[in-house]
Amino acid sequence: QAGFARMLGRAGLPGSPMIPAERALGSLLALKLFGSARHSHVMGYVFDEGLALWAGLNAIPKRAFLTEYSCRIDPDSYPRLMRAWFDALGRLGLAQGVSFDLDFHTIPFHGEDALVQKHYVSKRSRRQKGMLAFVVQDAGTRVFCYANGGVRKEDQNDEILRFAEYWKRRTGSWPEELVFDSKLTTYANLNRLNQLGIQFLTLRRRTRQMLDAIHRTPLSAWRRIELHGLSRAYRTPRILDEKIQLSDYDGPLRQITILD
């Protein structure tokens, strides 16, 4: 119903008479849904008739084709595909979200390219060469509505503003609420979001100075709340609700500190 083949054609994704673009993308998607972690693992599935049928082929393409496919894609194709996907979901009646989860994800790179920057890989708790991807997910529908797979380290702090501008162009209004980690952007950009009327929820960096201030807070300033409908072990945490000031941010910010 979304017209996936037409969408890929307008975006300019590569294909051939033997393996059109929608079949190539279908093969990659089939492997991902089946649980194959990497393209190099495809050789164990090339004789799986079910995966091939799902992708619309008589056999899943082999490792060499799938590995080089991304290198054949024009970088301008990704924004075109993203816009087409956004429009297609709108025609199908998918409601536009009001709250969005934002995050960076590092895709490890194991080659020798000197131009590839190092980024933090959370699963390995270290920095290594990789491509930094910025993804935005609708908190209500769980649909990914924005992505940029080529973020440079020097530009990553402003990526949140690029998403806000993209959403404004596509919908005519700014996103209502953004949820993200503390390392995603700067205090100055938080101030910019506030000026645009965009609400945000984020985690602060837990510095030594911040922790010392929390421990010096008298017990009378804390209050205990009860969380319902959750499976967490601690359902009655203590919270400290206060107003704070930050550098590069105009006006007060509401900060909620939680202790079990």
Each PLM stretch: what is its role?
Residues G97-D101, P175-E177, Q199-L201:
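Structural preference for beta-strand elements that scaffold enzyme active sites
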Residues R169-E176, Q195-L196:
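Short, surface-exposed connector motifs at secondary-structure boundaries
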Residues A37-H41, F109-E112, F144-Y146, A188, ...:
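Short helix/loop capping segments that flank catalytic or ligand/cofactor-binding pockets
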Residues Y45-E49, T186, T207, D260:
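Polar helix-capping/helix-linker motif
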Residues K129-G130, Q195:
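Short, solvent-exposed loop/turn segments at the edges of secondary structure
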Residues N191, L196-D260:
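An anionic, glycine-rich sequence signature occurring as long contiguous blocks
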Residues L178-Y187, R206-Q209:
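Acidic, metal-coordinating catalytic cores used for nucleic-acid/nucleotide bond scission
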Residues Q1-R127, A133-K153, N157-R170:
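Dynamic "connector" segments at or just before major functional cores
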